[in-house]
């Protein structure tokens, strides 16, 4: 009887109710900020956004003094795939092999991760878990930061294919100064190895295109049907330029080569990591390549807080988003994949705040973690801004979300209010209630 009752409670949806959020400063992102404004929600969708909405609602939520924002989107992260970086058993971000396009990151996400509620408590409602390892690492799907299972959490499968572009820098260290002399390579050997890796990647995509043509022609005009190969099947939408390829590249030469490769083959690409993207901002703008900049805090590499080169100013990566924006590049901010990035994803609003402090307009900074990732990931029809017709995924904070002192007080995902409790708040309450020494 208990099991039957439980199943029935899950199968029968809750009665739809109309909710009116009133009194808050509404940051629509796609339009003007309403101070104060009102948002009407019905069946999980935003029905109306205005200064005054004259209609009756089943429930009125007063948010006087609060700031209402659309849910933040982390466009490149290891959240859900990595729990404790020092514990191998909790790291499931990479697969064995150099070319694994059929890997699907969303099936590996741990819905019970303690890090997901922590990120959610600071306004992050959606995230893109990125597979890593090898050259073609696999595909990512967009997840919502709330749900019992991966099926609950996956809102869009196969968002992008991830390529970790081969290294393009040459090591000029003399052999006599090289630590492990057995691994030392001459400049000629390094250049040859680099060319071979790029050629292998180009050949891989050529084979994918050939497979796509064979699949289209199979069974027609007396031609035999092509045998289905999972890896090549996964490549079909990318070989046909239907879905974007996310190229993870930091070095200037890597980014240049990747953009030229994409332009030559008419591929849609997104550059992620993008440490040196500011150096080639014009090239990126000309080719309309969006950038996911991950180096505000993790600058040269994992957990590094200094620029990659001694000749760079201390603020080179703080000003990079503004440099890209001025050139006409669509800039998205994220915390990336390095080191403790999954645990520090909660700091996403503060990366945007740092960019504002060094020149990026505040409205652009807010778009870089809301509307722009929604557009690039193909979900702008339902996420990324507060406007009629979109999903009612938003949160109320007690101040500017780009201000370190602000706190998220309430959150709704698809019109349903979610719990903001997490491991951090539980520990806070636990130790706050500790008996004091007399």
Language-model features, listed with the residues they occupy:
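Boundary at the C-terminal end of the N-terminal hydrophobic targeting segment
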Residues: 14-18
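His/Asp/Glu-enriched, well-ordered alpha-helical/loop segment
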Residues: 84-85, 90-94, 99-103, 244, ...
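Polyanionic/metal-chelating signatures
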Residues: 115, 120-270, 407
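Divalent metal-coordination and catalytic microenvironments
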Residues: 24, 39, 44, 65, ...
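Bacterial N-terminal signal peptides
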Residues: 1-13
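C-terminal cap of metal-dependent C-N hydrolases
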Residues: 24-27, 387-431
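Histidine-rich, glycine-flanked metal-binding segment
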Residues: 26, 30-69, 88
């Amino acid at each position: 009887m208990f099991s039957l009752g439980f199943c029935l409670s899950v199968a029968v949806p809750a009665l739809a109710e109309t909710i009116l959020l009133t009194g808050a400063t509404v940051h629509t992102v796609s339009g003007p900020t309403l101070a104060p404004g009102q948002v009407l929600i019905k069946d999980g969708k935003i029905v109306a956004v205005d200064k005054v909405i004259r209609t009756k609602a089943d429930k009125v939520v007063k948010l006087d003094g609060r700031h209402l924002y659309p849910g933040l989107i982390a466009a490149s992260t290891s959240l859900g795939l990595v729990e404790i970086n020092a514990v191998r058993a909790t790291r499931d971000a990479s697969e064995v092999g150099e070319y694994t396009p059929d890997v699907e990151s969303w099936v590996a996400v741990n819905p019970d991760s303690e890090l997901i509620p922590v990120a959610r408590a600071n306004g992050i409602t959606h995230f893109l878990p990125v597979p890593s390892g090898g050259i073609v690492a696999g595909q990512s799907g967009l997840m919502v930061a709330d749900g019992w299972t991966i099926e609950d959490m996956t809102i869009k499968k196969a968002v992008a294919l991830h390529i970790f572009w081969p290294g393009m820098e040459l090591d000029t260290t003399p052999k006599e100064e090289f630590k492990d002399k057995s691994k030392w390579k001459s400049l000629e050997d390094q250049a040859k190895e680099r060319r071979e890796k790029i050629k292998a990647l180009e050949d891989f995509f050529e084979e994918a295109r050939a497979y796509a043509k064979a699949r289209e022609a199979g069974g027609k005009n007396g031609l035999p049907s092509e045998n289905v190969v999972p890896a090549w099947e996964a490549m079909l939408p990318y070989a046909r330029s239907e879905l974007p390829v996310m190229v993870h590249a930091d070095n200037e030469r890597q980014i240049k080569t990747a953009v030229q490769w994409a332009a030559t083959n008419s591929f849609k690409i997104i550059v992620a990591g993008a440490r040196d993207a500011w150096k080639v901002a014009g090239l990126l703008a000309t080719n309309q390549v969006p950038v996911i900049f991950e180096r505000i805090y993790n600058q040269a590499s994992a957990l590094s807080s200094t620029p990659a080169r001694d000749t760079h100013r201390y603020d080179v990566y703080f000003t990079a988003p503004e440099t890209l924006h001025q050139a006409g590049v669509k800039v998205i901010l994220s915390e990336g994949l390095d080191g403790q990035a999954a645990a520090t994803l909660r700091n996403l609003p503060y990366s945007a705040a740092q960019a504002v402090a060094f020149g990026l307009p505040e409205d652009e900074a807010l778009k870089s973690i809301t509307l722009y990732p929604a557009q690039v990931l193909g979900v702008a029809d339902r996420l990324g801004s507060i406007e009629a017709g979109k999903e009612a995924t938003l949160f109320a904070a007690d101040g500017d979300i780009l201000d370190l002192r602000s706190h998220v007080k309430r959150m709704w995902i698809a019109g349903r209010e979610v719990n903001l409790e997490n491991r951090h708040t539980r520990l806070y309450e636990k130790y706050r209630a500790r008996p004091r020494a007399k």
